[in-house]
Amino acid sequence: MRTLIWYCYFWGYMLIHWPTLHRGLKQLEAGDWQSGDALAKQHVPHWANRLLKLAGVTVEVYGKENIPADRPCVFAVNHRSYYDICLMLTQMDAPHGLVAKKEVGAIPLVRGWMRLLHCVFLDREDPRKAMTALNEAIDNVKKGYLFMRSFIRRIIR
């Protein structure tokens, strides 16, 4: 039953807040990154935190004070589930993005919210497209966004 409630909330929130997402994406297309970031900061941590609570996850953070506040960071995690992403979205104060496999970018609504979070979709089958995506992630880090990259043995197959 908990899983059903979790999925209903996951998709329900995205559907209910589709107009907000649409507005944020329009702002990004117009070059207004600050407004898009503000929308993401307002909605995404709340959504991710609720998902963690619905799953029964208790969060304890140690060492957050060691994260430099004056420059962007890249977090390389050995991620085993999507809860790692939810944790990052709820615990990091600075604007952030993700590097995700391209297949995630094919999921409606999820793709839009991830674009609002400056997510870069990585094509692991095509080395040139993968390098383009990684260069885009590097540019986002230079702009001041925290980035999370899951550790895998090989980025490109």
Model-derived features: positions:
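A transmembrane-helix-recognition feature enriched in membrane-embedded lipid enzymes
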Residues: M1-E60, G112-W113
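Soluble catalytic domains of membrane acyltransferases
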Residues: L54-R157
